[in-house]
């Protein structure tokens, strides 16, 4: 598995790739070649229950 430190660099994988921000996460979407889909920013800190 390949790991990339910068999601923004992945928009150059394919001419149709585009970077989109939704709900605090960053996605790279590619309609013509879906194997290039990427998401960054999943985990959030949970609140402490009392």
From Swiss-Prot:
Pfam families: Ribosomal_L36. Signal peptide: none annotated. One of its GO terms (cellular component) is ribosome. InterPro entries: Ribosomal_bL36, Ribosomal_bL36_sp, Ribosomal_L36_bact. One of its GO terms (molecular function) is structural constituent of ribosome. It comes from the Bacteria. PANTHER family: 50S RIBOSOMAL PROTEIN L36 2, LARGE RIBOSOMAL SUBUNIT PROTEIN BL36B. This is Large ribosomal subunit protein bL36. The gene is rpmJ.
């Amino acid at each position: 598995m390949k790991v990339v430190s910068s999601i923004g660099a992945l928009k150059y994988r394919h001419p149709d790739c585009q970077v989109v921000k939704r709900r605090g996460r960053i996605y790279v979407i590619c309609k013509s070649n879906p194997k290039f889909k990427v998401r960054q920013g999943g985990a959030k800190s949970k609140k402490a229950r009392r």
